[in-house]
Every structure is written in C-alpha cells, then in structure tokens.
C-alpha cells in the first residue's frame, strides 16, 4: 500500500511544483494560493511567526493556514527581481520599491533588514512582494549586505546608492 501524505486534503501529486530550495518545496494550489512544505519544522515555525507579524503590510503574502511542516499562503504571480534586472534597467520606481520593502521589514519588527533579490517579486501590476520571511528574525542586521551584493552582481549597486 502506498502512503500519500495529504496537507489539508491536498495531494501534492496533483499540484504544480513552483520551486524548491534549501528550505523545502512550493506548490501552486490555484491562482490565489500556494503551499510551502518545509524540510525542517523549526524553519516552518520561523516562517509562520514572521508571516503573522507582517499580515497588515501589503508587501508580504497573506497567510491562510499552516501545520507543523507547511504553510498555505497567498500565491504571488510575478518575476524575481534579480531575473527582472538581468533584462531590464534599474529605475527610480524600482529603487523606491526596494526602499519601501526595507522600511516595511523594519515597521513590522523584523530583526534582519536584509533580503536576497530573488525573494522580491514584481507582480504583473508592478507591485513588489517579499516571498520568503523565514530568516527575518534569526539575526539582527540593519545593513542590507545581501541586497547590495545582489545589486552589485548585476552592476546596479552604485546606481541604487546614488
């Protein structure tokens, strides 16, 4: 007998895999929701904690439900900022939105005010959304070194800082 684990009645075999990384896998449920399955329960708890903190800010996905090793959250349709900037120029609009995300991270109480460019999505309606918050409380950092390193690798660090 094959044992298939269901998450809130969802069979992952029937869902589209959006991506996988160090923390786990993300599957699309429908046009508005996705499920993130974590390899480690501790990381899942960290992401739940940070998503709860930022539910009132539009830069972060809505959290719908969760379990000990998964979350169901808002599906963010869009393109990662690093991929976007590899084909498009850095504009003042993009800079303003990066700064707005930094301010939002601070206002919701995150300790780590830094983010990788691939964790920022630009939606088709040109909104900027953060898709991964699990490490936001792990260490204290007010200098966005990861963000600046990403911009530097694309040749935009000096433009951003000017």
Feature map (PLM): residue ranges:
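Short beta-strand
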Residues: 19, 62-66, 112-113
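Active-site beta-strand termini and strand-to-loop segments that position acidic
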Residues: 28-31, 74-75, 123
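Conserved kinase catalytic-core helix
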Residues: 82-128, 144
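C-lobe/activation-segment region of protein kinase-like
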Residues: 124-162
